[in-house]
């Protein structure tokens, strides 16, 4: 899609969600915003007309922003399990440098870094990174 087409799509999605949407940024940022709004619209379509009962799962407790440890199955103890990807957009991620075992928090477009195979698959599916 061209940048103009992305802006038109953002306007349309913003109207459907009944909210203002930022129309500025790079083509990649606009494409990411379109994907996020589509996902949000899909979520609202699935729950439209349904009464959501209050349960333990959907009630705020005040502890939502507390930091917890990673799930045991997501902790990678062996770096040979990591795959290398190249960022297509600027990312804030929990990864390792492509060649050194150093943590990386921010990745710029074109930068290679290592993550688990599952995270790499999700990033490539969302157009955030490509496999190297």
UniProtKB/Swiss-Prot annotation:
Disulfide bridges in this chain: none
Cytoplasm found in the keyword field: no
InterPro entries, sorted: Packaging_FI, Packaging_FI_C
Main location: host cell
Keywords, ordered alphabetically: Host cytoplasm, Viral genome packaging, Viral release from host cell
Pfam families reported for this sequence: Packaging_FI
GO biological process: viral genome packaging
Keyword tRNA-binding: no
Subcellular localization(s) per the UniProt record: Host cytoplasm
Region of interest called Capsid binding, as start-end residue ranges on this chain: 81-132
Any one cellular-component term (Gene Ontology): host cell cytoplasm
Oligomeric form and interacting partners: Interacts with major capsid protein via c-terminus.
Function in brief: Stimulates the interaction of procapsid with the terminase-DNA complex, thereby increasing the overall rate of DNA packaging. Before packaging, it likely coats the surface of the procapsid through binding mediated by C-terminal domain. FI presumably dissociates from the capsid once it inflates upon DNA packaging, and is not present in the mature virion.
Protein name listed in UniProt: DNA-packaging protein FI
Native source organism of the sequence: Escherichia phage lambda
